[in-house]
């Protein structure tokens, strides 16, 4: 059914839109404080430094990191943090059924789960701004859930499929997070 295919594509597009709306908040958290640096890799020592900063500055008790898969892959390649099959899971307090597709599979470092998201924008220098934050730093508020409707347009001799949603993303507590900049260049596949 063509409407099922279109509905799936529209749903995926709306999810990406909401995702990137949240990403746009990262650079302004904590008064624009950013950790990490452009052209620097997501090494275990850099991640540990960011975690220490977050804990020392009282970001909260449910801290997480979200970054681009290319950055997280460098960490995975560089460090012995890869979880063996099923022995390590998300830190407690996370909804595994909702976040399993974004969890990096890395052991939590100092109790901090690391997630990856390919929707993070990579700039012309191959850097991306992710986030280290507490769960209470940002929020999404929905007044109208996502709806899909069909609308017949006789002049086009077609049926349009329209998707709508009314929501907002905002900083709930600015002091509980910071942008996290690391290199996000793709790892070589031909070594």
What are these regions (language model features)?
Residues 1-31, 57-59, 65-66, 150-169:
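Long, contiguous amphipathic alpha-helices that act as assembly "spine/axial" helices in icosahedral shell
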Residues 20, 24, 33, 73, ...:
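Flexible, active-site-adjacent loop/turn segments at secondary-structure boundaries
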Residues 26, 47-55, 112-114, 120, ...:
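Generic hydrophobic, helix-prone segments enriched in Leu/Val/Ile
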Residues 27-106:
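Extended, solvent-exposed, turn-rich assembly/linker loops in the middle of proteins
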Residues 78-191:
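Sequence/fold signature of self-assembling virion shell proteins
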